[in-house]
Amino acid sequence: MKTLLLTLVMVTIMCLDLGYTLTCYKGYHDTVVCKPHETICYEYFIPATHGNAILARGCGTSCPGGIRPVCCRTDLCNK
């Protein structure tokens, strides 16, 4: 009986952990819930004309290039 109870507890913990999804900033103030396979929040600048740069934020599977890339793996860490 104890073995069955322990097995049920372990299965429950595993199922809860597998259901976790990351939340990242997208743009300046908006947030987005990442897809299950996207495990990284990123932030970087895209060069634009006249010396300006555009901020890019979101979810990804790997750290992208760009100017001053920042990548992290916790909720809302890309601000």
Curated annotation (Swiss-Prot):
Binds with high affinity to muscle nicotinic acetylcholine receptor (nAChR) and inhibit acetylcholine from binding to the receptor, thereby impairing neuromuscular transmission. Compete with the binding of alpha-bungarotoxin on muscle AChR (from Torpedo) with an IC(50) of 0.31 uM (SNTX1) and 3.1 uM (SNTX5). Is able of exerting muscle paralysis, spasms and increased respiration. Belongs to the three-finger toxin family. Short-chain subfamily. Type III alpha-neurotoxin sub-subfamily. It comes from Pseudonaja textilis (Eastern brown snake). Keywords: Acetylcholine receptor inhibiting toxin, Disulfide bond, Ion channel impairing toxin, Neurotoxin, Postsynaptic neurotoxin, Secreted, Signal, Toxin. Gene3D superfamilies: CD59. GO terms for cellular component: extracellular region. This is Short neurotoxin 1/5. Pfam families: Toxin_cobra-type (PF21947). Expressed by the venom gland. One of its GO terms (molecular function) is ion channel regulator activity. It is found in: Secreted. Residues 1-21 form the signal peptide. InterPro entries: Snake_3FTx, Snake_toxin-like_sf, Toxin_cobra-type.
